[in-house]
Amino acid sequence: MAINTSRTQILFITIISFLILAQNVNSAAFTVSNFDPYKTNIELEGNAFISDGSIHLTNVIPNSAGRASWGGPVRLWDADTGNLAGFTSVFSFEVAPAGPGLIGDGITFFIAPFNSHIPKNSSGGFLGLFNAETALNTYQNRIVAVEFDSFGGNSGGNPWDPAYPHVGIDVNSIASVTTAPWKTGSILTGFNAIAFVNYEPVEKNLSVVVRYPGGNFVNGTSNSVSFIIDLRTVLPEWVRIGFSGATGQLVELHKILSWTFKSSFQ
């Protein structure tokens, strides 16, 4: 009887271990409320750095670009079953002027192959994701991003952008597939924003909402945009998730203050 009990316990432990491992493989979840360069699992590229508990995606100088991404791969879909994961990414950020005058260029939340790295010459309107050779070449890229573009296609701006600051969804190109105006009065007053990026795998709906919860000028202000996309047609099974930012001739602050991410398969 003791032998059978022991075998039963071993079998039970084995099954539980397998289920825990399967859950870990098929889901991802983390929350970072204070970024520590020595403890946080964040990979920095380009000009990105961590200071005072926040990720700074760029230096406060012209033509700066940087990326910060989670240090491990995230499973976006299952190649054996074809099942898609749903996910929610919630992060607070600050885009603020570094001085008087116009500001630029913006930040993104991106999803790319895990072996992806920041391209050379990706400052300015390329937002740390593309360069002149890849920006509009949809066949060369494998990337989906949500951009928060503070400059837009103003006089002397980028020809692929609408003529106003905007929130956009990018698919393999810097030219967004859909955009909504970004009420950037909040940027000029220095308020922090909270962005909610959600992917619903059944409807294949990628949606974005950005809110400014504080301050008299922007209290309750929100912007939203969504796009139907099957992420399996664009991205590999395992991906890198993170943020990018860039300045061009104009300069602004680009800070990620906190980040919560959760993905799961149904």
Curated annotation (Swiss-Prot):
GO molecular function: carbohydrate binding
Residue positions the entry lists as glycosylated: 121, 205, 219
Signal peptide: 1-27
Protein induction: Accumulates in roots during colonization by arbuscular mycorrhizal (AM) fungi (e.g. Glomus intraradices).
Family: Belongs to the leguminous lectin family.
Function: May be involved in arbuscular mycorrhizal (AM) symbiosis with AM fungi.
Protein name: Lectin 7
Source species: Medicago truncatula
Gene for this chain: LEC7
